[in-house]
Amino acid sequence: MISILPSRDDRVVASGSEVAGGPAGTRVLLGATWWNVFRVLILMTATAAAVGYLSKYYCLINGWGEGKYTHLCYSDIPPLYSLRGLADGAIPYISDLPADQVLEYPALTGVFVYLAARLTPAGNTDWFFDVNVILLLICWLVAVIATALAQRSRPWDAAMVALAPGIILAGTINWDLLPVALVAVSIALWAHNRPTWAGVFLGLGIAAKFYPLLLLGPMFLLCW
C-alpha cells in the first residue's frame, strides 16, 4: 500500500518541513529508521499530554479550589473524588448514597472512575487525578493509533488527534477521552469492513457517553 507523505501532500506541512531539511525526496527510504509513523505519533501524544498536564500545574500545587478558573486548570476529576464518595470507597451506582452524590456519568465511565479510585491511595485527591491522567493518556493513545489505522495510506492524519489543542487543554477536565477512544476504534473497524465489531465498540462508546449515538444515523445511511 502506498503511504501518502504529508510533506508532499500538504502545503502547510511542506513549508514547515523546511526547518528539518524540506519535503521528503524521491529517494527517501521509508521504514529505514527506528522512528516509524506509529512511534512518532506516540511521542507526539505523550508530549501533548505532558503539556496538558503542566497546564494544570497551578491547581496541582495550590489545590483545586480557589483560582481554578482564573488559572485555567479546572477539572471535574478532583472534586468528584470526594463529592461522589469515591474517596470513602463508594462503588458507583451500587453504594447507598444520597441522590446528589450519585455519579452522573454513564455506566462504563463509572467503571473507569471506580478503577481509578481503586488504584488511588485512600483519600489522596492529587493521586486520583494523576491516576486518571495516566488512564486517559492510554485512551488518547488508543484513539490516535485507531485513527492512523482507519486509513492506512494516510496514517499521519492521526497527528491531528495527537496534537489537538482541544484535547491538550481539556482532555483531563473529565473522562470524555474514554468514549473518544472507543468510537475511534469503532470507526477503524468499520473502515476495514468489520461491522459487527464496529457495532460492539460503538455500543461500548454509548455506554461511556451518549454522544456516540449520533453515529448511528450515518451508519444506517451507509448500510441502506
Task: List the predicted regions and their residue ranges.
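Perimembrane helix-loop-helix junctions
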Residues: L214-W224
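Transmembrane helix irregularities
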Residues: W190, L204-Y211
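TM-lumen/periplasm interface segments of multi-pass membrane proteins
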Residues: I2-S153
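Membrane-interface junctions at the ends of membrane-embedded or membrane-associated helices
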Residues: A191-V200, C223-W224
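Multi-pass, polyprenyl lipid-linked donor-dependent membrane glycosyltransferases
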Residues: L135-I138, A158-L163, I167-V185, A208, ...
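Specific aromatic-rich, kink-prone transmembrane helix
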Residues: A146, P179-P195
